[in-house]
């Protein structure tokens, strides 16, 4: 399917959002890759970050160049620092990674 972009979301130049993804109330900076089936809500995704397929992110900040693996779940105001990698199937609720 297509991409669902709602809630006043903004997407920067050169960003790629995969099929079946939902972006709601987010700021997506330049050069971000969001793989198919991801859901990103009320979050900020910094330049060059990658969000893996079928990952759910809610209320988080993902730093520049960070990589979130496939089938991950991040929520609760979590901050992923620049360049950090969260492995596939990771579930994080703590404030910092």
What spans do the regions from the language model cover?
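Left-handed beta-helix
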Residues: 1-97
């Amino acid at each position: 399917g297509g991409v669902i972009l709602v809630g006043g979301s903004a997407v920067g130049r050169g960003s790629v959002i995969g099929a079946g993804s939902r972006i709601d109330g987010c700021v997506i900076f330049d050069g971000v890759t969001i793989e198919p089936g991801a859901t990103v809500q009320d979050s900020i995704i910094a330049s060059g970050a990658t969000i893996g397929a079928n990952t759910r992110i809610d209320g988080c900040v993902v730093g520049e160049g960070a990589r979130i693996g496939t089938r991950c779940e991040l929520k609760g105001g979590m901050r992923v620092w620049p360049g950090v990698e969260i492995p596939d199937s990771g579930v994080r609720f703590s404030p910092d990674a």
